[in-house]
Structure formats: C-alpha cells, structure tokens
C-alpha cells in the first residue's frame, strides 16, 4: 500500500506502506508478512490529548511543542526539519495547560515555516540519503515504529510534486501555515489603507451620482470604515455593480475587495493598480465631457487648459503609484528572503 497525502482537510488521512523485503546474508529475501506494521506516532494517547485536537497534525504538533519526541540525528534526513532541530523550541511548552494549547500551537507553528508554505508531518521509514544503510536507521527505533519528522514545502503544488517523488515516506498529515506574520500583516494593512483612501476619494467625487447613494455601496463603505478588518461579503455583493455599464461601478467593486479578509499581497497590489487606472480613465472621460460642454462658452480656452492640467496630474499619479508599490513589494520580498536565511541558519532546514 503506497503512502498518500490529503491536503487542506479537517480530518487526516493516514496510510502506510509495507516495508520493502529484507535480504539476509545469502542474498535471499526475508518474509516481512509477520513483521508488525508501523504504528501511529507515539504520544497520541489520552494523556496528552489537549482539548481533543481534531486532526492528527494537531495532536502531533502538541507533542512536538511539548518536547515529547525522541532524538534523531540530523544527518539521517538532510532535507527535512528533524525533531532534534526542534528541541530548543519545545522547552517552554512542557508545562502547557489545556486552555493555552490552541494559542501556543499557533506560536509553535510559526517556528516551522513562512506564510503560504506547507508543513507536512511524515514518518520516515527509509533514509532519503541512499548512502545511509537501512539497518542504521532501523537501529534508532523499534521495528514497529517510524521516525516522526516535519518537512516544509514552499507551496502546495511543490508539496504535491515532492511527495510523489519520496516513495519511502509515510505521509501522515499536512497543513498550510496561515499568513499571520507581523511583517506581512503590516504591509497588507498599508495596502488596504491605500485602497480605502482611493475608495473614499472616489466616493466623495461621486456624491451627486446614483452610485454613491446606492444602499449596498453605502453599507459596505460604512461597515469597512467602522471595523478594523471589515466584514466578509460574498460574490452577491457585486451584483449591484454589474448594473452600471460605465466605470462608475469601480467604487463598489473596490468596496467589495476591501471587505475580503483573505487577500494576498499580489491581489491587493493588482487591485490598487487596476483601481487607479480605472479612476484615471473615468477622470479623463469626465474632463473630456466637460471640455465639450464648454466649447461654446467664452471661457473655452481656460476650460481646456484646466482639463490638460488635470489630465497631466492623473497620468502622473497613474505612473507614480504603481512604481512606488513595485519598489515596496520587492523590498518586502527581499525581507522575506532574509528571514528565511536566518531560519535556515538556526537549523531549521527548508526542503529544496
């Protein structure tokens, strides 16, 4: 039976693979039929089952945070986070109380990977390094046990690819690290603030239009302005915006985007650029309309000059804002790379 992995599930799917046939001194295969199958990792008893964690991942993570694991030599598994490397993170969790388990679990998870990466708990049956003898690994633990290891993948796609290559592992459970790091949240809050400013500016410009007086538009605007993160709306919130054939629906769409909680930085950046370009096009359209209206008036020349000034300002802002955000994005990207190097230097090994 081959090992399988089930990503993004609330209930872990556990399956194990039969060990390959052993060979004796006469190069004859030994019968493994009577050999006990690997058991689920130690520490999964009622004694340490704080608040009855729902998944195997939660149970194992509690045990790792509590220090309930055995020493494993780092050289055995060269592309994973071994339990030995996690020992220094577990000392403060030994007096863990049940009511503190969920919070400390999240704090413990932060030590393992960056946001968006996949943490996988596996049981190593055979060494990933072919230069290590199989018997040397079995000597570390009983024959009916496996070595628990945390492995980190850069993305869910990378996890799916790598797990199909590692035929020697028992895949126990996987979980995506939540995006809860301070730097990421800070940058995301800054981008959301910029979007809110654009949203408010457009709202003020459209006070006399039917868009600004739309009840759904006002409800979303006021709700987001009065709360820190904003409520969560489904796609039905965009229905009123679809009834407007022109660019006046942009503020309502921006309001919908602002109320979503699970936005990536790239999505926010794209929305800022798109919103600014759309608002600029709308402003240019309005200026052109104003120019046509005042062609027959005495002040046609001054009206045209003012329109040209407004057009220049809009174009300048359209260029400046994306450039500034691009610089900020790459600064943040370099910062995350630096953080990863620091984590690697503290014996937390990220898989290649």
From Swiss-Prot:
Low complexity compositional bias, start-end: 22-36
Listed name of the protein: Uncharacterized protein S9
Skewed-composition ranges (Basic and acidic residues): 8-21
Entry keyword set: Host cell membrane, Host membrane, Membrane, Transmembrane, Transmembrane helix
Membrane protein topology class: Single-pass membrane protein
An example Gene Ontology CC term for this record: membrane
Top-level lineage group: Viruses
Localization (cell): Host cell membrane
Main location: host cell
Region (Disordered): 1-40
């Amino acid at each position: 039976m081959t090992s399988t992995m089930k990503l993004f599930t609330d209930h872990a799917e556990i399956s194990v693979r039969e060990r390959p046939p052993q060979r004796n001194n006469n190069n004859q295969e030994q019968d493994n039929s009577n050999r006990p199958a690997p058991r689920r990792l130690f520490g999964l008893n009622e004694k340490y089952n704080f608040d009855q964690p729902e998944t195997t991942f939660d149970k194992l993570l509690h045990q790792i945070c509590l220090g309930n694991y055995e020493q494993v030599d780092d050289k055995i598994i060269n592309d994973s986070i071994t339990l030995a490397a996690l020992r220094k993170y577990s000392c403060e969790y030994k007096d863990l109380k049940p009511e503190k388990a969920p919070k400390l679990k999240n704090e413990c998870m932060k030590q393992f990977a960056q946001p968006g990466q996949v943490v996988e708990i596996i049981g190593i049956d055979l060494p990933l390094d072919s230069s290590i003898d199989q018997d040397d690994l079995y000597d570390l633990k009983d024959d009916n046990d496996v070595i628990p290891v945390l492995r980190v993948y850069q993305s869910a796609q990378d996890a799916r690819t790598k797990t199909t290559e590692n035929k020697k592992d028992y895949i126990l459970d996987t979980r995506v690290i939540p995006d809860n790091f301070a730097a990421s949240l800070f940058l995301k809050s800054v981008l959301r603030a910029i979007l809110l400013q654009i949203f408010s500016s457009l709202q003020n410009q459209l006070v006399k239009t039917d868009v600004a007086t739309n009840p759904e538009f006002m409800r979303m605007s006021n709700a987001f302005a009065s709360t820190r993160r904003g409520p969560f709306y489904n796609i039905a919130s965009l229905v009123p915006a679809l009834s407007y054939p022109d660019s006046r629906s942009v503020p309502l769409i921006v309001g919908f985007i602002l109320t979503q909680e699970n936005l990536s930085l790239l999505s926010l950046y794209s929305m800022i650029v798109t919103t600014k370009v759309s608002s600029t096009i709308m402003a240019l359209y309005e200026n052109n309309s104003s120019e046509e209206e005042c062609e027959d008036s005495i002040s046609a020349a001054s009206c045209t000059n003012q329109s040209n000034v407004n057009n220049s300002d809009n174009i300048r802002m359209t260029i400046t804002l994306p450039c500034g955000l691009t610089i900020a994005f790459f600064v943040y990207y370099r910062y995350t790379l630096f953080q990863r190097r620091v984590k690697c230097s503290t014996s937390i090994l990220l898989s290649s």
